[in-house]
A protein has these predicted regions:
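Class I S-adenosyl-L-methionine-dependent methyltransferase catalytic core
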Residues: 1-78, 85-100, 111-298
């Protein structure tokens, strides 16, 4: 197994017994029990139903996201590259297109250690392993939704994101692809991303039929490791490889760029790491941040 993928598996506590194909949640053995814990069961016994669902989740104890083998990742990237998507129309793009997000959510485990300002450790993983928050999320699955599969992993993951406030978000890959194709309708165009983040733009832009040359700058050592892994997967899946540069955008000088597009940090609203290359560490006040980071980057 690839060493980076093994690190990812270790972070998510994935064991061989959890792997149920190239794309899995780990909860496949209890799906039939989830099916019996439907809305009528909840209406009859809310507290008991929530407890039964909670016990099933704790019996496996994996954060309820989609997991992949390496072949599963390659297949998922190919599927992402081939599906239809909403383009920019009248300078607008529709909301809600989350295709590709599960790939980044799985690979970029350090998204789980980033902290919204003032919230401390409150990631999806933290919430899942907090019994009270998990039970609140399960209750939300029933009280706010109708239909089937109310307590399946996707539903519980979405409910956990509603529990106790802010979430560190990744840029939607489909939006990145649509926006860059709108701004830069140039085959093999050079697209500069001055704040790579968790791979949403790399995945979206790298999957475009325009075959862009993606150039991305990112200071975070751990994030760069996962960006390089995603870059390798893109090369294998669709034959496109970007350029990942570990540097700070205020110092890096790009050349021959057709389009610059990114989603930079907003001073200290989110903490990604304690490395001295982080702009919130380098620049201690908002004025210093504007003059030292924002203006040179632009």
């Amino acid at each position: 197994m690839n060493l980076v993928l093994q690190e990812i598996y270790n972070f998510w506590n994935i064991q061989n017994s959890n792997i149920r194909g190239d794309e899995f949640t780990g909860y496949e053995p209890v799906y039939d029990q989830f099916d019996t814990l439907d809305k009528p069961a909840y209406n009859k016994d809310p507290e008991g139903t929530v407890q039964k669902v909670f016990d099933l989740y704790r019996s496996i104890n994996l954060v309820p996201i989609v997991y992949y083998t390496e072949q599963g990742l390659i297949r998922a990237i190919r599927d992402f590259a081939s599906i239809g998507y909403n383009s920019v129309k009248d300078n607008k793009i529709s909301l809600g297109n989350n295709k590709g997000q599960p790939i980044s959510r799985f690979i970029f485990t350090n998204m789980m250690t980033a902290e919204p300002k003032g919230r401390g450790h409150n990631s999806l993983k933290d919430r899942f392993y907090d019994d009270k928050k998990l039970k609140r999320a399960i209750n939300l699955c029933y009280s706010m939704r109708e239909g089937n599969k109310l307590c399946y992993p996707t539903a519980v993951r979405r409910a956990l994101e509603l529990v106790t406030g802010e979430n560190v978000q990744n840029f939607k890959p489909q939006h990145a692809r649509s926006i860059v194709e709108h701004l830069c309708p140039v085959l093999w165009g050079n697209v500069y991303d001055y704040s790579c983040g968790y791979g949403g733009r790399l995945l979206g832009i790298g999957s475009s039929n325009m075959k862009y040359n993606y150039i991305g700058v990112e200071p975070n050592t751990e994030t760069v490791k996962y960006l390089n892994y995603l870059n390798d997967l893109l090369d294998e899946a669709v034959g496109v490889r970007g350029t990942i540069i570990q540097d700070v955008s205020e110092d890096y000088q790009p050349t021959d760029i057709d389009c610059a597009f990114s989603s930079p940090p907003y001073f200290n609203l989110e903490k990604y790491s304690d490395e001295d290359t982080q702009c919130m560490v380098r620049y201690r006040t908002l004025d210093e941040w504007f003059s030292g980071y924002a203006e040179p980057t632009i």
